[in-house]
């Protein structure tokens, strides 16, 4: 189910790119902060509204732990998205893609130090495969890497995403209802990005753009149904059933789906909105990088089963 969440998040890459291009066209005087806010706030508001309607009857039964976990998840997600989007303006996309996946290494390192227990050779091998695959997939160039503002912000965003993953693993939250914490998460992010949008809007009319443009409504609809409601409900429901280390590695599949969708969707979106957004092409980096990330996840999933089968025999 988490792979399905990755598929939905993969759709967000070309969709958000198309949306930001259209927003920049419709509001040429706006800054990057406003465009970032307007690419997130509407779908969070709509997603929160949908869940609010569905849960209205027993909303009063929301527990303090559900509120606490939902707010924590929302703040971690909002912080990660803010830093990632801002950092992308000061570094190459390939560098951003690679450094964002750094939580795949940070999670097992953090847990090993905290629990004083080595997770085992298999986990470290899978981490190495994932990082190598992410580097190849993003065409990362070590020679061009310098720790400037963009790189530091992207690394910081990875810490926030790690916090989001670890928050879902905490035992004290295991009794929380996924749909309830997801509602609180959406409301938290909606508030953060709505305030940011109002504070950075070039004019009051610019705030109405996501609701008055047919292409933007379509993009927001896709992001709301699949990348927000679908993906986050799946994540919050199923991730607590596995370890944070395993989840971190599985989430690294997301760029593969994003790269595959970028092979066809940009041209389609360019026909829906008057933007220039060309399809990407199939390259060896997608095939090799994707194969390494897939191999790491297959190995992580199958190895314990082989050990159990051998022990039973």
Language model regions located:
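Hydrophobic alpha-helical transmembrane segments of multi-pass integral membrane proteins
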Residues: 1-4, 30-54, 68, 125-132, ...
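Specific alpha-helical transmembrane segments that line the substrate/conduction pathway
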Residues: 38-41, 45, 83-121, 155-158, ...
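Loop-to-transmembrane alpha-helix entry segments
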Residues: 100, 113-136, 147-151, 267-296
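Glycine-/small-residue-enriched transmembrane alpha-helix faces in small-molecule transporters
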Residues: 1-38, 75, 79, 83, ...
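Hydrophobic/small/kink-forming positions within alpha-helical transmembrane segments
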Residues: 10, 14, 45, 74, ...
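Specific transmembrane alpha-helical segments of multi-pass solute transporters/efflux pumps
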Residues: 56-96, 134-136, 224-242
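C-terminal-most transmembrane helix of multi-pass membrane proteins
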Residues: 44, 245, 252-313
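Membrane-interface helix termini and inter-helical loops of multi-pass transporters
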Residues: 17-30, 89, 138-147, 200-215, ...
């Amino acid at each position: 189910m988490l792979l399905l969440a990755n598929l939905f998040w993969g759709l967000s890459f070309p969709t958000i790119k198309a949306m930001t291009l259209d927003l920049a066209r419709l509001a040429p005087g706006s800054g990057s902060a406003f465009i970032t806010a307007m690419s997130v706030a509407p779908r969070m508001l709509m997603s929160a509204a949908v869940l609010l309607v569905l849960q209205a009857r027993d909303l009063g039964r929301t527990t303090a732990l559900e509120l606490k976990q939902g707010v924590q998840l929302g703040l971690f997600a909002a912080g990660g998205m803010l830093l990632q989007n801002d950092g992308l303006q000061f570094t190459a996309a390939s560098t951003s893609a690679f450094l964002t996946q750094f939580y795949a290494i940070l999670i097992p390192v953090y847990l090993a130090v905290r629990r004083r227990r080595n997770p085992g050779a298999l986990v470290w091998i899978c981490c190495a495969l994932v990082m190598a695959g992410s580097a190849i997939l993003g065409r990362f160039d070590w020679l061009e890497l310098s720790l400037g503002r963009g790189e530091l912000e992207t690394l910081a965003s990875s810490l926030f995403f790690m916090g989001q993953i670890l928050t879902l693993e905490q035992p004290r939250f295991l009794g929380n209802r996924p749909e309830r914490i997801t509602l609180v998460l959406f409301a938290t992010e909606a508030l953060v990005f709505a305030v940011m949008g109002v504070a950075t809007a070039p004019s009051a009319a610019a705030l109405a753009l996501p609701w008055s443009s047919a292409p933007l409504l379509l993009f927001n609809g896709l992001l709301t149904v699949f990348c927000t409601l679908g993906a986050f409900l799946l994540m919050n429901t199923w991730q607590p059933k596995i370890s944070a280390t395993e989840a971190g590695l599985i989430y690294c599949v997301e760029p593969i789906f994003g790269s595959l969708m970028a092979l066809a969707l940009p041209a389609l979106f360019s026909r829906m909105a008057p933007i220039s957004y060309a399809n990407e092409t199939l390259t060896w980096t997608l095939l090799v990088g994707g194969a390494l990330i897939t191999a790491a996840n297959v190995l992580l999933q199958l190895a314990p089963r082989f050990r159990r089968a051998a022990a039973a025999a």
